[in-house]
Design a protein with these regions (language model features):
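Active-site-proximal or metal-binding-adjacent scaffold patches in catalytic folds
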Residues: 1-82, 91-159
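Walker B catalytic acidic pair
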Residues: 87
């Protein structure tokens, strides 16, 4: 599947989230946040996503690997809520759709709304996506919303 809006999504992140590529969590806090996301997702008997978190050195990209069922973050720039939430949104989208398509953007936006310290509103997210010419699916139809909207996971305690 062609990833037609990848560069648009990256540009949007860079403008919407100040210091996107700046570390703001420790490795331990990334693990705690990841564990809370996993606990929230797997809290229902009908959902079981086996996923691990790995850290590596280097200046390349961070990624989600569906085949290995892991999220990989870089020590030098990937230790932040926004990068972890970006990669977790890929895991929720699970390769069924375009990598940075509407489903991914909706999942990522909901995760930012719920778990980023600034808690951007859906209105703010939609306006910024519109301004960046990024397509998205309905936030409240996303898997992230269905799973996490009523979950009181303690991500704030992770950081």
């Amino acid at each position: 599947v062609r990833d037609r809006q990848r560069s648009k999504v990256y540009a949007w992140e860079g403008s919407f989230i100040p210091d996107f590529h700046k570390n703001n969590l420790s490795e331990d806090n990334c693990v705690k946040m990841f564990d809370q996301l996993q606990k929230g997702f797997n809290s229902s008997d009908d959902r079981n996503m086996k996923l691990s978190l790995r850290f590596i050195n280097g200046h390349g990209r961070c990624w989600h690997s569906p085949s290995r069922r892991e999220i990989v973050l870089r020590f030098n720039w990937g230790l932040s809520r926004q990068v972890l939430l970006h990669e977790y949104a890929h895991a929720l989208t699970d390769g069924k759709y375009e990598s940075h398509g509407g489903e991914f953007v909706a999942n990522y936006s909901v995760l930012l709304h719920l778990f980023h310290p600034k808690h951007p509103s859906f209105r703010e997210l939609a306006q910024s996506l519109r301004d960046a010419n990024v397509d998205w699916s309905d936030f409240k139809s996303s898997l992230a919303w269905k799973v996490f909207r009523r979950r009181k996971i303690k991500i704030a305690e992770a950081a």
